[in-house]
Amino acid sequence: MVREKVTVSTRTLQWKCVESRADSKRLYYGRFILSPLIKGQADTIGIAMRRALLGEIEGTCITRAKSEKIPHEYSTIVGIEESVHEILMNLKEIVLRSNLYGTRNASICIRGPGYVTAQDIISPPSVETVDNTQHIANLTEPIDFCIELEIERNRGYRMKTPNNSQDGSYPIDAVFMPVRNANHSIHSYANGNEKQEILFLEIWTNGSLTPKEALHEASRNLIDLFIPFLHAQEENILLEDNQNGVTLPFFTFHDRLAKIRKNEKEIALKYIFIDQSELPPRTYNCLKRSNIHTLLDLFNNSQEDLMKIEDFRIEDVKQILGILQKHFTVDLPKNKF
C-alpha cells in the first residue's frame, strides 16, 4: 500500500494519487485528488469522470465457447465435476488484458485428471491473463478437455443472445468494464474570501488496468468527446447556419485516419494512441516507458531511435513498421535528418 499526505496547492490545478494498493490480482484500488477547484467545478468533473470510468473504458473478455461434444448448455459431461453452465460462468469471470482490435480466437486443450485454470488458455500474443489461478473446471478422470474460445475487446456490458447451439457454440455474457466501481466526494474549504473545493476520486479495477491507467484512459476519452468542438471552426460546423437540418458529422477513429490523408496529420496523430494498435504487451510497454504514447510521438522517432530503447529488438521495429504500413500506409525514416 502507498499513502501520501494530502497537501492542497493554491496555485496550479493538479491531480495527485494519495493512496494506491493491490488487494489481490483482480482488485486494485486508487484514491486521487484534484485541487484547487472553484465552487461547483468538483461536482462537474466528478460526475463526468465517474461516467467515463464506468462506461467509456474498453476491456477484454471471453465472449463465446465452442465444443462439438457438448449437447446443450445445461448438460453434464462424464469426468468433469462442473456442468457446462458452470464452466461458462467460470469463463465469464476470467480477467484478460490486451490491446487487440475486435475478436480473436483462443483455445483450451488439456488432459485430465486435474484442474483446468486460466493458465491453460492458449491465446494470441497480444492477450495476457491477469490471474492464472482462476478456476475453470475440475477433470476427475483421464479425459480430453478441448474447447475453442472467442476473445473480444469492447466496452460496457452485453447480454448473450439466444442461440440454439446447433454447432456447439455457446455465447457468454460479456462484462467489458475493467473499472468495478468509482466514487467521488468533495471537500470544501475557504481560501481567504474565496470558497474552493478538493475533488476526491476513488477507483477500483479488476487488475487488467491500474486505477492510474484507468484515470488516464477515462480522461483521454473525455478529451476525445470534446475534440469536435475544438475543431468546429475548421470543419465549418456552425449551428446557426445549419438551416437545412443537415446531420452533423460523427467523429470516429476512421475519420482521424481520413484526416491523415488530408494532410491534417499532426492534429489526427496526436489523438491516436499506440494502445489502439495490435502491439504485443512487451513492445507496447517499452514504448510507453520511453514516453511514446501516441502515433505523433512514434512518428517523431526514427527506426534508429527505436533501436536505442532499452530491451527493444529489430523484430519489434519490423512489427511496428508492418502495423504502420497496414493501417496507415506510412513508414518511419531509418535515420533522423
From Swiss-Prot:
It comes from the Eukaryota. InterPro entries: DNA-dir_RNA_pol_insert, DNA-dir_RNA_pol_RpoA/D/Rpb3, DNA-dir_RpoA, RBP11-like, RNAP_asu_C, RNApol_insert_sf. GO terms for molecular function: DNA binding; DNA-directed RNA polymerase activity; protein dimerization activity. DNA-dependent RNA polymerase catalyzes the transcription of DNA into RNA using the four ribonucleoside triphosphates as substrates. In plastids the minimal PEP RNA polymerase catalytic core is composed of four subunits: alpha, beta, beta', and beta''. When a (nuclear-encoded) sigma factor is associated with the core the holoenzyme is formed, which can initiate transcription. The N-terminal domain is essential for RNAP assembly and basal transcription, whereas the C-terminal domain is involved in interaction with transcriptional regulators and with upstream promoter elements. This is DNA-directed RNA polymerase subunit alpha. The gene is rpoA.
